[in-house]
């Protein structure tokens, strides 16, 4: 198949985004396929739930199944049920394995470990592994070293004609497109609109939004984005966040360990408080290795080496423990990774002001912050040094003869500390954009 045929077939089978990776000699079924010295591929690819897979010679291991299909040269697809991502936090790196198992139409002849003679002959040649990304699956296609597609795409990569994505991939859809410039130009237009009424998109139409927290919905509506809870970038490869305060909420994962998961009422009676007979609360900031005087709980990171900034025990996690060592609530590292992968590597924080005068209005800009490279290593380190903290808002109210729960488990960071989460942070004024 030529390049356009590959694109057409991947899209015919549901791909909405196409990326590719030039394969090195070491990218084979024996040594697995290298997906980068970070966990960004986990954010890019729609994988299954992350789980602990024990400890190997390479240290702790996490795995995530990948609903992966091979596209054959005749345009048919077949599932490779053993396909998975393997995460090595010690390095860190991700590898792709199991992609040939129980799949008759897999390109096994192209994915074998090379002999020394083959390795030397192919030293400056690359197969191209294409990934068509759909909502719930990945469709793969690989080319031969000497195919015209391989030669053409490799030449374009060397000429920097494809934007890099998730460290080792290239974005086929955005050939020669500068998404950052597009984003800033769009925001400049929105800034020049001045005050915009609070609104959101519902069923494809813009409707008024009267609640006080409408800045994010309004910004999304101006980009034509409908709130749907799908973990995809808001504008090309950027996540948009309207920002005006001193604190940023990073993620809201429910605990998967401890008393909280078994009996919320008992959790609140043991560690919360009650100012009214019909209400119990648990709402107090907890920071790593700092005893919370109100709840008498200590937040600890079990199985984490702060000096090496790496996970040492895949079955460890972030735990709230009482003075007897009981786990009140906790999050395994698998749970944290699973939630983190839904975040985006590139985030644009958009400042805004609000007016409440015969209706709520917002103006976005002029201050913009572009943050790139949101690595899990930075996130865990920020937790350890208390920059990221747990800020819950949990209660139960006694209504109609029963206790009714309201859960909000937030991990937050102060705006002044946000740079610790990213590799690069740049502040821009839209007034400077021509």
Model regions: which residues?
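Nucleic-acid endonuclease domains
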Residues: 1-234, 242-434
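Short hydrophobic-acidic sequence motifs that mark active-site Asp/Glu residues
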Residues: 237
